Amino acid sequence: MADEELQPVPAAEAAIVPSGPTSQWLTENGFAHESLAADKNGVEIIKVEADFLLPIATALYAYGFNYLQFQGGVDLGPGQDLVSVYHLVKVSDNADKPEEIRVKVFLPRENPVVPSVYWIWKTADWQERESYDMFGIIYEGHPNLKRILMPEDWVGWPLRKDYISPDFYELQDAY
């Protein structure tokens, strides 16, 4: 009996993350996703496959997440995935403590393609363009997906961790 109490907990059991209220709502309504651990502020985080982003984003909008506060990219390191991150907020009369959720879509480095959420939240316009410009994440269906910070002829994606910056870049027609 004493030996059984000292047995280590299997990693699969230790890694179980409790679902937050929004994740539970998505599960009840048949949306495929995975709950990740909440951040230090208690914001619920879910992982979504790229193919399911638009249906889930539409459902979250209908559920009351009417404001895309932030969309950005993350590079997990050379040879690893890129992540498209969406921070959504329920803006309502209860402005003291709005409900928030973060949606993460993990994408293969070789072909980082995800549907654009521009048609759900217009605030995604420049944010998706910046993620494209800096990380090379392609947002299918975006109405104007082109570089926003770097010159159009820039080669590469400057915020990728495996990016090698050129020794010299000539500015043309600078004045």
Curated annotation (Swiss-Prot):
GO terms for cellular component: plasma membrane-derived thylakoid membrane. GO terms for molecular function: NADH dehydrogenase (ubiquinone) activity; quinone binding. It catalyses: a plastoquinone + NADH + (n+1) H(+)(in) = a plastoquinol + NAD(+) + n H(+)(out); a plastoquinone + NADPH + (n+1) H(+)(in) = a plastoquinol + NADP(+) + n H(+)(out). PROSITE patterns: COMPLEX1_30K. It comes from the Bacteria. It is an enzyme of class 7 (translocase). NDH-1 can be composed of about 15 different subunits; different subcomplexes with different compositions have been identified which probably have different functions. NDH-1 shuttles electrons from an unknown electron donor, via FMN and iron-sulfur (Fe-S) centers, to quinones in the respiratory and/or the photosynthetic chain. The immediate electron acceptor for the enzyme in this species is believed to be plastoquinone. Couples the redox reaction to proton translocation, and thus conserves the redox energy in a proton gradient. Cyanobacterial NDH-1 also plays a role in inorganic carbon-concentration. This is NAD(P)H-quinone oxidoreductase subunit J. It comes from Nostoc sp. (strain PCC 7120 / SAG 25.82 / UTEX 2576). The lineage of its organism: Bacteria, Bacillati, Cyanobacteriota, Cyanophyceae, Nostocales.
